[in-house]
UniProtKB/Swiss-Prot annotation:
Keywords carried by this UniProt record: Transposable element
Domain of life of the organism encoding this protein: Eukaryota
Region (Disordered): 67-87
Protein name (Swiss-Prot/TrEMBL): Transposable element activator uncharacterized 23 kDa protein
Extra remark beyond the main annotation: This protein is coded by the transposable maize controlling element 'Activator' (Ac), which is able to activate chromosome breakage at a specific location.
């Protein structure tokens, strides 16, 4: 009896340790695909909630935005137009962002480095850039946003608006006005950390109350 039990244990251990490499690879590939599917589902859920919050059309057409001055006096107007409490955004026309060289729209990103949604329009296609990690690099100014959160998928939309008469400020700071579309993390709103020293005190939750 003891010999039979020992033989069974030895057989099981041998089968497990000597599993063909191809089988292990297939299993790991399947696990990776499951992870990708889970990440996609997380993004789809957040995307649905975001569309409900920002007033996207039911058929999924993208709605462009233009930035307002963060913490400015037109907060009630922004809330009325965007539907997001404290949001620094005003809905622009569905035809797109004005193309007079003072608006830049960067794309949504996720930790894998792949676009997490439709890429925002830009005056020149080469100005929209995605980067591995959660964050967006501003091609024109060289600034890069800090990490936002350790989650599977973060949707991020950044609009840079340089109003007339602020060119000197733009040259000195690298960027003059900045607005965040709220970062979507499982349906909750938050505001990321800005690593640029001149802007550390401008992108804070204080400027965007819940």
């Amino acid at each position: 009896m003891t010999q039979q039990l020992g033989a069974m244990v030895l057989t099981c251990c041998t089968a497990k340790c000597c599993e063909p490499v191809s089988s292990r690879g297939d299993r790991e590939t399947a696990d990776g695909r499951m992870g990708e599917r889970r990440a996609v589902e997380v993004w789809r859920t957040a995307d649905r909630r975001w569309r409900m919050a920002d007033g996207r059309t039911a058929d999924g057409r993208a709605v462009e935005w233009r930035s307002g001055r963060m913490g400015g006096p037109r907060r009630d107007g922004r809330v009325a137009s965007s539907g997001v409490e404290g949001g620094p955004w005003m809905a622009a026309s569905a035809s797109g962002v004005p193309r007079h060289g003072r608006h830049r729209v960067w794309c949504l990103v996720q930790p894998s480095g792949r676009p997490a949604g439709r890429q925002g329009e830009s005056e020149r296609a080469g100005e929209s850039e995605t980067r591995v990690g959660v964050g967006v690099r501003l091609a024109a100014s060289g600034l890069r946003r800090g990490r936002v959160a350790a989650c599977e998928c973060v949707m991020l939309l950044l609009v840079w608006c340089l109003p007339p008469g602020r060119e000197a400020e733009q040259r000195s700071l690298g960027i003059s006005y900045m607005g965040w579309a709220s970062v979507v993390m499982d349906g909750s709103w938050s505001w990321p950390y800005c690593s640029h020293p001149e802007l550390e005190n401008t992108v804070t939750k204080r400027d965007h109350p819940d």
